[in-house]
Regions:
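Bacterial N-terminal signal peptides that target proteins for export
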Residues: 2-15
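Bacterial N-terminal signal peptides
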Residues: 14-24
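Carbohydrate-interacting regions of secretory-pathway proteins
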Residues: 27-215
């Protein structure tokens, strides 16, 4: 997805000692405190905008394949969409070859177009856009795919205050700390999640989507 960004502070962590207590505890094997956002059988709690046919449930996964569309998590009451501020999100993801998708955080439902609020965590292991899976689009650019196509991998996103931490298969890719004074709508605030169907040539699967609210 193409849009402009203005950012100037990224912390890349080779050894995430400072995250050991915080993120390490949150990724405990028992998943205590996590709530499931996807029931594995339907799109209940989710709302697609333009081109809703780009979404289906297949073999226990949400599959995006078709023209541009975004699937917003709204929760049990679409009139009052669910909202998250500090959280730890986990999802299992599988990309097909040359597929592009994304996971939006702190966003808001809208009828069409690229989401105007929040950040996009890129999902792309081999498509023409060189910005690969895990990148915070137009903010933190990762050019080495951390996972392979046609293989399930675990994507984790944690937001605490102004810090965004992304992991793939248990490995910390980076911590981004948003600078003070950011204006506009592409910033951390609060909001919901959205999945992206990028284009008709892209197919990506999502399953076991769950979140834990953090203080």
């Amino acid at each position: 997805m193409d849009y402009a960004g203005r950012w100037n502070r990224v912390h890349r962590l080779a050894v995430a000692a400072c995250l050991g207590g915080c993120l390490g505890g949150a990724v405990a094997a028992d998943d205590a405190g996590f709530e499931r956002l996807f029931d594995g059988t339907s799109l209940a709690g989710w709302q697609a905008n333009e081109n809703p046919a780009s979404w289906q449930v297949r073999d226990g996964a949400i599959v995006c394949h078709g023209p541009r569309s975004h699937l917003f998590y709204v929760g049990p009451d679409a009139a009052k969409p669910a909202e998250f501020k500090n959280f730890h999100l986990k999802a299992e993801v599988k990309t097909r070859p040359r597929a592009n998708s994304g996971l939006f955080i702190h966003t808001r439902p809208q009828p069409d177009g690229w989401p105007a609020h929040g950040y996009e965590v890129q999902v792309n292991n081999s498509q023409g856009d060189p910005v690969r899976t895990g990148s915070l689009y137009n903010v933190v650019k990762n050019f080495a795919a951390p996972a392979e196509d046609d293989t399930w991998f675990t994507l984790e996103v944690m937001v605490v205050g102004k810090a965004v931490t992304v992991r793939v298969d248990g490995r910390v890719l980076y911590e981004f700390v948003e600078p003070e004074g950011v204006t506009g709508t592409r910033k951390l605030s609060a909001g919901t999640f959205a999945l992206q169907a990028h284009d008709p040539g892209s197919e990506v699967h999502y399953r076991n989507i769950r979140v834990k609210r953090l203080p």
